[in-house]
């Protein structure tokens, strides 16, 4: 049982809460919209419906806000956000929407250009927020 890695200890009283939104990919892939653990809410990468990147951005933020509310948190408590876009040129049109969503509480952020699960999606957003 030796090895180079130390054992991992988990506090006995730590609870994990899983939040499902009923999204189509949750059951297909085997994940949930958000997990509350260790004082944080971890929201899975979230896409939104719509024809434009702006519509999809607003829809994704709405789904994220709903998950955070179910977890007892909010967009104001987001500490980290990652944006995934197939085309980085689509990011700038989202800036006013994102600035409005996070208002006076901007989180640390990263934007990554990459393919998404389906070509119809133009943006995916993943956040971590303080719980409670």
Place the predicted regions along the sequence by residue:
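Short, Lys/Arg-enriched N-terminal segments with co-localized hydrophobic residues
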Residues: 4-13
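Short, polar/acidic, helix-capping and beta-turn segments at strand->helix junctions
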Residues: 13-132
């Amino acid at each position: 049982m030796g090895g180079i890695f130390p054992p991992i200890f988990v506090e006995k009283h730590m609870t994990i809460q899983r939040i499902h939104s009923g999204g189509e990919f949750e059951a297909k892939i085997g994940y949930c919209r958000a997990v509350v653990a260790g004082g944080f809410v971890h929201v899975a990468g979230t896409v939104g419906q719509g024809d434009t990147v702006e519509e999809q951005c607003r829809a994704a933020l709405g789904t994220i806000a709903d998950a955070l509310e179910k977890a007892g948190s909010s967009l104001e408590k987001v500490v980290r956000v990652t944006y995934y876009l197939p085309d980085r040129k689509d990011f700038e049109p989202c800036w006013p929407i994102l600035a409005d969503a996070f208002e006076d509480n901007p989180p640390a952020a990263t934007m990554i250009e990459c393919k998404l699960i389906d070509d119809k999606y133009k943006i995916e957003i993943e956040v971590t927020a303080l719980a409670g």
